[in-house]
Amino acid sequence: MNKILLLVILSSIVFGCSRQKVVEATYENGKPRIIKYYHKKGGEFVLDREVVYYKNEQKKIDGEYKDQLRSGLWKAWYENGNLWSEGEYKDGKRNGKGISYHENGKKYIEGMYRNDIRVGVWRFYDTTGVLTSEVNFDLVPGSLERDSLQ
């Protein structure tokens, strides 16, 4: 039991020392606007997560990095705390399902991305969540529309 406890303590010390939280920007009141997290790899610190906040301290954007590029699930929120958008990234580009929501929490848009480009059928909803239209971006000439969480 003591060996397990010692292992847990040592692991937490090593992990705690290898990940660094850096407040990169603040608001006038001193509260964080952008926090980035870095881990130690090969003697240097590498970006692995970014969190952006509104002035009211509500989370605005949160996502992971791999090899300095956006990777995995990224989420964005309205200032009121409701989810605004979520989507998957791979190698810094949107890939997979993307969903955006109205500020009231109802679904607004959903569809698929491939290398930052909208592909396949996209569905659009009104503020009550009722489907209003569908667009097949594979059939729309010149539809190389690029989107990204900003």
Give the location of each predicted region.
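Periodic aromatic/glycine/histidine/acidic cluster detector
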Residues: C17-Y78, N82-K90, R94-Y101, K106-R114, ...
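Sec-dependent N-terminal signal peptides
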Residues: I4-I13
